[in-house]
């Protein structure tokens, strides 16, 4: 057995997590919180080992003195390895992963709507099988991204008529982007989210409301009821909906104009600016968006429930909950790392909780009281 190269360890708060790249990160069953034994085993599995070999390695490391010690180690090692296999982090061989490649590069992601390849120079190519007007989208490697996203072309879309269309990734032309045809609008979100990630911004799958001068995100998978809950706030006259499906969050760094920042951190690693929500025209099928920026108050992880109640979340669980709702690119470990770094930073300064809710107004009343208490206690 050997570890799947699409998995890696990421430090979140005081804990270590094993996370996959790609769409699997949206599934909690693919995420593992690692203890000391799991970290040791993960390190050993960087080369091919039989699980039975791990029993001996761990017995020697911990100095098993008798059969009882060996039995305990056997059970613990077996349980950790079973968890690795269950999540897909441990595989029979690298060859069994069947990584496909063509002239564009190694394939990282394949779905009905998009296929992503990694190029030899570290960039990416996105292909849209169902689109008529857009075929390939070419993204520069991170090293090619300059500091000022307003001054040069950042991505190219190739349509099937072989015409190269260059767009500027600029806050100045978001109004124009909103008028694009459907395929171009969807295609431009990919490079926009990629280069936003490079400067410390992530898209969260969520509906959002403006309440008490701050934006609050209700994050959940499609069909959970995030739009329904947001409409409760609007119906009761307490808030207005800012975006019905996708919200771009980051830190508001002064001095860079138009909301774009080179980085959310200074050279010592300290956070710069306060958490912020940036208006974009991407809003799923809701049709609701604003091209304005607001302070971010908090993120509520939404779950359907038979009764309304709020569950406090640890910092680490809050980060994992938000990370699972990120729709910014996480095609490889480098991009997962960027998502983790941004979200772990923002999560320090916002309210995070989990709301189990019904479709009744009582869910709105409960959440409003919770936010009021949070704000009044600051």
Task: For each feature predicted by the language model, list its residue ranges.
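Glycine-rich, often acidic-flanked micro-motifs
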Residues: 3, 12, 51-52, 206-207, ...
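Pre-Walker A adenine-sensing motif
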Residues: 194-211
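Long, charge-rich, low-complexity alpha-helical segments
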Residues: 30-112
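Charged, amphipathic alpha-helical linker segments immediately N-terminal to NTP-binding catalytic cores
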Residues: 148-192, 371-373
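Post-Walker A alpha-helix
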Residues: 229-230
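Short Lys/Arg-enriched alpha/beta "domain-start" segment
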Residues: 105-139
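Conserved lysine of the Walker
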Residues: 226
